[in-house]
Amino acid sequence: MRDAPDGGAGLAQQRAFAPVHGALVMRQGTGVMFCGDSSAGKSTLAYACARSGWTYVSDDGAFLVRDRADRYAVGDPHSIRFRPDAGELFPELAVHVPTVRPNGRMALEVCTRHLGIFTAPGCAVDHVVFLDREHRGTASVQSYPEDRALDCWAQYTCLGTGDVQTAQRRCRRLLLQASLWKMRYSRLDDAVSLLERLIDQTTSSPGGHGR
């Protein structure tokens, strides 16, 4: 997961933000967060969405702003990190050379200004989508249980004083007001198309997105 935005002091970050391990993108003003483990394809899907005209906010780490009640999160829109073989999925990435990260793993990190995509520093989170990339067949989506979502987010409440951790948990609970989904997919184009239909349906329905 990425560091908090702007590289500020750790204590200030803990007091200002609630970190969430997730990618963040936006389509026509609707914010979508992708959650899941390290192999779920968060960065890859975020970039696939951006290539289709979405706005990119962050690939692997989003930070909820604790003093806001609208589930607003910020990220690092200036770069995006891929697995070394990302050029096999996205030919335009083949010219970039993987480098060794501090953890010893190879990764491909690319400045978004070289990719011709829309970016933004943050957005409100209207949908949270938990990814299952191992599925074979047509992409599908279903509601995701709130308790499982809270369990997933809880693992990132490990820094700061007890009061800070409590405030971070309270902030993450605001994400339960967003629409929670689990999406199974194997093909990126199917996943992007399904997400676009989901957003179109929910934003056009009475009451809009959210719960």
State the predicted function of each range:
Residues 45-46:
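Post-Walker A alpha-helix
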Residues 42:
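Conserved lysine of the Walker
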Residues 22-37, 51-211:
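Glycine-rich, often acidic-flanked micro-motifs
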Residues 1-28:
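Extreme N-terminal, non-catalytic leader segments
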